[in-house]
Structure formats: C-alpha cells, structure tokens
Regions:
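Juxta-kinase regulatory segment immediately upstream of eukaryotic protein kinase catalytic domains
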Residues: 1-23
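ATP-binding glycine-rich loop module of kinase domains
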Residues: 41-62
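Conserved HxN/HPN-centered segment at the entrance to the catalytic loop
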Residues: 77-92, 96-97, 102-105
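Active-site activation/catalytic loop segments of kinase-like enzymes and analogous catalytic loops
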Residues: 280, 307-348, 364-384
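ATP/Mg2+ or Mg2+-diphosphate-binding catalytic cores
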Residues: 368-473
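Conserved short submotifs of the Hanks-type protein kinase catalytic core
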Residues: 100, 118-126
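ATP-dependent phospho-/nucleotidyl transfer catalytic cores
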Residues: 106, 110, 129-156, 163-267, ...
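Active-site acidic catalytic loop and adjacent metal/ATP-binding pocket
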Residues: 33-44, 246-312, 445, 451
Length: 473
C-alpha cells in the first residue's frame, strides 16, 4: 500500500505517458531485484510493464539524475538500446520521495528523500547474460564473441554519453573517477576501520588490523557464506586486498602525473547484470538488446579537473569476464577478445601508459569486487545483522583472481599482448573508420542529424562498417 502511494504520487496517471496507473488496484507491483544500492520493482497493468528503481536509504547520490540523462541520450541518439525513461511530476525524469504523503498517517521514514526512476520494461523479459562464464551459450566460441562485442560497447557508451557531460546540471557533484576514494570509503564502512589504517603504513598498522578483525570474527554466523568469509579473513585476505589497492593507487596516480589521460567523460560498469544480449549460434554472433543501470558512472569536466580513464572501464569489465567466478582462474583468451573489441573502436592506438594503466585497472576491478561483496556481509560482521536477505557470494575468490593474474603476468608480458592485438592491418582499418567518425562528430552534419533524430541510423552504419571488416577476417 505504501509503495503504491509513493509511486502514484511521483507518477500521477493523468500526467504520465507510461500507461500505468499506480493508484489502481489492478496494477500489480512486485519486487524483482535488490542490488547493493537500489530496490527494483516491476509494475504491470494490462500487459504494460514498467521498472521502478528506488535508491536505498543512505545511498542518495547526485549523479542519479545524470545517469538518467545518459539513458535517454543512448536511446535517442545512438544504436545502444535502452528503455524509455518516463517523466513524472513537473516533467522531471527522476523523482524524490517526499517526507509525507497526503492521506497517509506517519512519515515515509524508510524511503523519504530517496530517488525514484520509472522506465519501460521489455514485455518478453530481459535477455540476461549469465553470471557464470560456463553458462554462456556457444561454449568457448560464444564466450569470445560476447567478450569482443562488450569491448566495443564500452567505447560506444562513453562516446555517446559524452554529449550529456557537455551540459551537466549545475551544482552536480562528480563521482570519484579513479575509484580510489570510493573504494577506500567502502573498505572503511565494511570493516569499521579508519582511513589511515587502510593505508597499512607499517607493521604496527598490520597488527592493529589483524587484532581488529579477530575481534569482529565471532559476530559471523554459521551460514556457508559467513563461514567462508571468516576463513578468508583469518588467512589474511583483507591485508592482501589492501596491499594491492594501495599499490595500484600509487601506480595509477604516478602514471597520470607523467602521462595525463584525455578527458573521457563517462564510465559505465559493463557486467552481466547491466547488459542484455541474445546469441545467434548459426553465425556465432551476439546482439546487445538492452542496456541499463547507468548508476556506476564517473565523469569529469574541464571545470572540476577530473580526468576519467576509459581504460578503467575496460579493466572493470575484464575483472568480471576474464576470470572464473568460482575458481578464480584467469582466462587470457577472454581478455584478448574483450580488448580486441575495445581497440576496434579507438581512433588511435593505446599508448604505453594507457596499456600499463589497463593492467592495473584489471586488478583494481577485482579489488573493488572484493569490497562490494564484503559489504553484503558487513552488517553481520559488525554484529548488526539485517533481516534483508541478499545473495552473498564469497569475497575470497577475488584474492585468488589477483594471484592467478599475477602468475600469468610472470610469463606473459601484458603490453606485448595488447601491442600484438592493435598492430594488425585489420585494426588499422578499424581506426580509419573511427577517425572519420571523430571528424563527423565535430562537424555541422553531426548537429543536423542530431536535430533530425537520425543519429541512431548513422551509428548503425558505423557498427556495420566494423562488422564488415571482422567478417572478412
């Protein structure tokens, strides 16, 4: 009843073109997902479906509005498929839950102040990419074809949404582009430690961390997830992760001082839960059919000085798709395929600094996953278990992933692998196409097509030109 009133207030039927009347008892509302930062509900009325996302208490972020704008930008001006975002009260694309609602006794203590967005839903469901690599259709061939498609998708999303960044809402606070401030904050909150202690400056810090963790371990229960988490902490997983995190921060910051990155405004976390795709086994080809959840964006402008890195996004994607989620094994062929698709969409080769940063960002992606997975167990670890039950995968696998990657690097220079991929005649032809695309995006013709609404057709032609080169291969 409370949710129905919240949704009806934010999206009044008479003012909304969504086609869903939330005040009607005929409208069915069900929870379909609970992620780390948000609840997702599915509303259905007369076969019309819509997704409603509510940001969880404590996670209100100013870039929610920006991510909604990016969703609309992709839908209207590119070949990237997204759902339509509906406008609510005052024609706004995102809503805020009020403190009180007329006719409702008591305030909305749980949801008050949270952001809501409403988007259409696919009538036949979402084309989900399996979380487990072995479940991806087509076996190894299907995996590699998907990896290549996702590599190019990373660049397409950033390029398309950069237009939104040029017109950021005033007063919008930027996210943390390099990922270190956010990562350190999550580590502090997960394990109730100070920022200073996350730095592990000396042996005294390490002893203090070990003592602190030992003090928390009795809080963990007897579930398989909690027991596995306890075993990982006892063998020093958190120290391994923090050591890796601190070294990566040093490496990347030093790299950016010596070789500043170009300002690439948009980063989107490309992982199975954020992309829908279908597989054509006859030609071993994937088509991306849905793109959503742009909440994990970092962006920068010339005014705030943030320099976001496109290779960071590729590294994050590789941390999902180039490692076995259960054994932690590194799959070099998956990494090569994803990097190949990424390189095909760049107008120039990656330079040495970018390649080294990519290697670091793969590991940072793994470290980030450890922190986020730990957060699902954090309340129990701190003696404050919650009644909200979520899937809680073992964070310890990410320590294994880091070790597996480092073992591979000992005999396989990462830079040599990337250089071999980007130094083929076919790759030069891909770059020629992208150089022409850069010229187009800086021409009057671009603005004409944007005004006409014909940019998606241009984007589709660009996709076809790249596909033609790959078919000849």
């Amino acid at each position: 009843m409370l949710l129905r009133q919240i949704f009806a207030h934010a999206y009044p039927f008479e003012n909304s073109d969504s086609g869903v009347d939330f005040s009607s008892p005929d409208t069915k509302i069900q929870a379909v997902n609970s992620g780390r930062l948000s609840f997702v509900f599915l509303a259905e009325q007369n076969r019309i479906k819509a997704f409603l996302k509510i940001v969880k208490p404590g996670f209100v972020r100013d870039n929610i509005a920006f991510s909604v704008l990016c969703t609309e930008e992709c839908r209207l001006h590119s070949s990237i498929p997204t759902f339509q975002t509906y406008r609510g009260k005052n024609a706004e694309l995102h809503q805020t839950v009020p403190e009180h609602l007329e006719g409702l006794s008591g305030e909305l203590s749980l949801f008050s102040g949270q952001s809501i967005t409403l988007t259409e839903a696919a009538l036949d469901g979402i084309d989900e990419i399996p979380e487990t690599l072995t479940e991806i259709p087509g076996g190894r061939r299907g995996q590699l074809a998907l990896m290549e498609k996702l590599g190019g998708y990373i660049v397409k999303v950033s390029r398309t949404c950069s237009v939104v960044t040029d017109n950021l809402p005033k007063g919008l606070e930027t996210a943390d582009p390099a990922g270190f401030a956010t990562g350190r904050q999550v580590a502090r909150e997960d394990f109730e430690i100070s920022e200073y202690l996350t730095q592990l400056h000396n042996s005294s810090d390490r002893k203090e961390l070990q003592y602190h963790i030992q003090h928390l371990l009795p809080n963990l229960g007897n579930s398989p997830e909690a027991q596995s988490f306890r075993e990982g902490l006892q063998r020093g997983d958190l120290e391994v992760i923090l050591d890796c995190f601190n070294q990566l921060e040093k490496n990347i910051h030093e790299s950016l001082i010596d070789n500043p990155a170009p300002n690439v405004p948009v980063l989107n976390e490309v992982k199975p839960a954020n992309v829908g795709a279908v597989y054509d086994a006859a030609v071993n080809r994937w088509e991306i059919t849905q793109s959503f959840d742009f909440d994990n964006m970092g962006f920068g402008t010339s005014e705030n000085g943030d320099q976001t890195l496109l290779e960071k996004d590729l590294g994050r994607t590789l941390s999902f798709f180039a490692f076995d989620p259960e054994s932690g094994e590194f799959y070099a062929d998956n990494a090569k395929a994803t990097i190949k698709g990424y390189l095909e969409r760049l107008p120039e080769k990656m330079n040495e600094a970018e390649i080294h940063r990519l290697q670091d960002y793969i590991q940072l992606g793994i470290v980030t996953s450890y922190f986020w997975r730990s957060s699902y167990l954090a309340e129990e670890l701190q003696g404050k278990p919650t009644e909200i039950l979520l899937a809680r995968p073992d964070p310890g696998v990410h320590v294994t992933q880091i070790r597996s990657f480092n073992t591979w690097l000992k005999t396989n220079p990462f830079a040599d692998m990337v250089e071999a991929l980007q130094s083929t005649p076919q790759m030069e032809r891909h770059r020629d196409i992208e150089r022409e695309a850069v010229l187009f995006r800086n021409s009057p013709d671009y603005h004409t097509k944007r005004a006409e609404g014909t940019l998606p057709a241009y984007d589709t032609e660009l996709d076809a030109a790249h596909d033609k080169i790959n078919c000849i291969e």
